[in-house]
Amino acid sequence: EDTRVSLKLLNHLELKKSLVSYHEHNKAESGEKILARLLAGETCALVTDAGSPAISDPGEDLVRLCAEHGVTVCAIPGPCALVTALSISGLPTGRFTFEGFLSVNKKSRQEHLTGLKDETRTMIFYEAPHKLLATLRDLTAAFGEDRRISLCRELTKLHEEVRRMTLGEASAY
């Protein structure tokens, strides 16, 4: 995504590597360039600014492109916000569904939530901080104010925060 973020880590480790930015706005062009280099025998590492590459992340499309062209993709397990959040949520972990980021289009978002109305598994959503309150209101409208939730942010970082409450309490928080 933003090469400056990865560059900090590479510089700290004193690694000199060529970086190619790959994000939502350049993925068609950058994806083809990266694929051409891989097909020519080069290797690369897919990293992301935060979280796990390809999980609610533009890297998902790059992995798909590689798979379509027979390029082997290997995962190196590491931190994953959704599993980390689930493990400390206090909610049932036996069965869950990951919904990623909801659509910014209000109608699409409401249709998606309506389709989940009867879902009994723990549901995991990602949301940007500046959209959280509106999303909590939409979730409350879809699932009712008594549904238990866990709000997790800055996981594994200095300012980690986990709040466990109902949707009604969260909307008023």
Go through the PLM ranges and name each one.
Residues 3-4, 21-27, 79, 100-105, ...:
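Short, acidic/turn-prone active-site loops that include or flank metal/cofactor-
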